[in-house]
Amino acid sequence: ATFFVVGNFLQDNPDLIKQMQKEGHTVGNHTYHHPDMSQIATQETFSKELSDVEDLFKKITGKSMTRFYRPPQGKYNTENLQMAKDMGYHTFFWSLAYVDWLTDAQPSKEEAFDKLLGRIHPGAIVLLHNTSKTNGEILDELLNKWESMGYQFSSLKNLLKTEE
């Protein structure tokens, strides 16, 4: 899996970050403060949002962060995409998501399965938030159901290899 993390998640969960890396997961950049990046006009401000996450990741793990970036809320402008590219980042978006991030209004397991199973498609990049209790409860079963539907899983790193 690829986990796109923000600054406070890194600060609050250093052991989990180390575990993600140890298990071979990719940890990507979701900005330090989770702002609306489409409203950021300068390279300096944009770079700081990403470099602060990079620096904290390196402090925790001793390693450089993979240059994968996901804009908060999927908000961006064309200048932002170029800024990320100029910093050496690959920008990723999702093709399948549902409202799972509201901690006080979690979908039921049935609602989650209905949305996630009904919307899966070849080549899907699925967005699931770690703040979702429901996602934690259904993840193993969800992955098994997708596999039984004939889907296979791959990393974003492998996706990039197929494009090169």
Regions found by a protein language model. Give the residues of each.
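A short alpha-helix capping/helix-coil boundary motif
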Residues: 33, 58-61, 94-95, 119-123
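Active-site environment of divalent metal-dependent phosphoester hydrolases
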Residues: 34-36, 75-78, 99, 133-135
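Terminal accessory/targeting
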Residues: 1-2, 122-164
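Active-site beta->alpha N-cap acidic-glycine motif
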Residues: 1-41, 45-66, 145, 158-163
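His/Asp/Glu-enriched short active-site or ligand-binding loop at hydrolase and phosphoryl-transfer sites
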Residues: 75, 80-119, 151-163
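Soluble non-cytosolic domains of exported or imported proteins
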Residues: 4, 11, 40-47, 74-75, ...
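Solvent-exposed, polar/charged alpha-helical surfaces in well-ordered, non-transmembrane soluble domains
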Residues: 15-18, 22, 44-51, 55, ...
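Structural recognition of the beta-strand scaffold that forms the well-ordered cores
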Residues: 1-5, 26-31, 67-71, 90-95, ...
